[in-house]
UniProtKB/Swiss-Prot annotation:
Catalysis performed (reactions): (1S,2R)-1-C-(indol-3-yl)glycerol 3-phosphate + L-serine = D-glyceraldehyde 3-phosphate + L-tryptophan + H2O
Entry's family note: Belongs to the TrpA family.
Function, in words: The alpha subunit is responsible for the aldol cleavage of indoleglycerol phosphate to indole and glyceraldehyde 3-phosphate.
Protein name: Tryptophan synthase alpha chain
Associated pathway: Amino-acid biosynthesis; L-tryptophan biosynthesis; L-tryptophan from chorismate: step 5/5
Organism: Francisella tularensis subsp. tularensis (strain WY96-3418)
EC number(s) on file: 4.2.1.20
PANTHER family for the chain: TRYPTOPHAN SYNTHASE ALPHA CHAIN, CHLOROPLASTIC (PTHR43406:SF1), TRYPTOPHAN SYNTHASE, ALPHA CHAIN (PTHR43406)
Encoding gene per record: trpA
Cellular component annotations (GO), alphabetically ordered: cytosol
GO MF term (any one): tryptophan synthase activity
Matching InterPro entries: Aldolase_TIM, RibuloseP-bd_barrel, Trp_synthase_alpha_AS, Trp_synthase_suA
């Protein structure tokens, strides 16, 4: 199978566009609506998906995404339900890259190889383990390679050159570039400049860098693309739309549609 990320970035480059990638937690606010939400993100123009599996202690997430985890868990969602939703999304959208963003404990609890295999079977393209830096990732990387899943690494803005070099050599799929250090979300807005990090990643021939953390407005997407990123990920801002419209499904889906269209439009050069 041709790598879906490679195909996506090549197609976007031809069209002079960047990627817009929304993040949501699978199962938020419940299993049935979660599928509709993810379906809406794709049909509204998302280029790829970054999805979380609910976890009781999401360390690196800001309050918005922590609350999404709690909502999903309280609705009774299980990892099996999450894989069911992923399988349905993959069946409906054969070409879109699907990435998971999660924590090591969740992977360990299921057994690394078993978990990666389940991800592959459900149509997942990449896994980013938020609390495992590149230099500690060997056991995950080896299995990712074995089952042909891209292992994604985070490049922090304060990373040393040797760390950036390592991320470039070990990562595949794309590189998750942090726009700042700390927890995710628009609680503290993204601060550029990341140009220096982008220059280094290009120099080391890293997988395409996508900027995340604190991306909530079209102009931030524009800035990211202008700075040389291949795209932008928006998590907290997407999840906030779910949170603000819990009791009004139609309004929620309408607002998500508008948000994705507006953010995607900002990737056009």
């Amino acid at each position: 199978m041709t790598n879906r990320y490679t195909t996506l970035f090549a197609n976007l480059e031809k069209r002079n566009e960047g990627a817009f990638i929304p993040f949501v937690t699978i199962g938020d606010p419940n299993k049935a609506l979660s599928f509709e939400i993810i379906d809406t993100l794709v049909s509204s123009g998302a280029d790829a998906l970054e999805l979380g599996i609910p976890f009781s202690d999401p360390l690196a997430d800001g309050p918005t995404i922590q609350e999404a985890n709690i909502r999903a868990l309280e609705s009774g969602i299980t990892p099996k339900d999450c894989f069911d939703i992923l399988t349905k999304i993959r069946a409906k959208y054969p070409h879109i890259p699907i990435g998971l963003l999660l924590y090591a404990n969740l992977v360990y609890a299921n057994g690394i190889e078993n978990f990666y295999q389940k991800c592959l079977d459900a149509g997942v393209d990449s896994i980013l383990i938020a609390d495992v830096p590149a230099h500690e990732s060997k056991e995950f990387r080896d299995i990712a390679k074995k089952v042909s899943i891209a292992q994604i690494f985070i490049a922090p803005p304060d990373a040393s050159e040797s760390t950036l070099k390592q991320i470039s050599e070990l990562g595949s799929g794309y590189t998750y570039l942090l726009s700042r250090v700390g927890v995710t979300g628009t609680e503290t807005a993204a601060n550029m400049p990341v140009e220096d990090v982008l220059t280094k990643l290009r120099e080391y021939n890293a997988p395409k860098p996508v900027l995340g953390f604190g991306i909530s407005k079209p102009e931030q997407v524009q800035q990211a693309i202008k700075a040389g990123a291949a795209g932008a990920i928006s998590g907290s801002a997407t999840v906030k739309i779910i949170q603000n419209n819990i009791s009004n499904k139609q309004k929620m889906l309408n607002e998500l549609t508008y948000f994705v269209k507006e953010m995607k439009a900002a990737t056009l050069n």
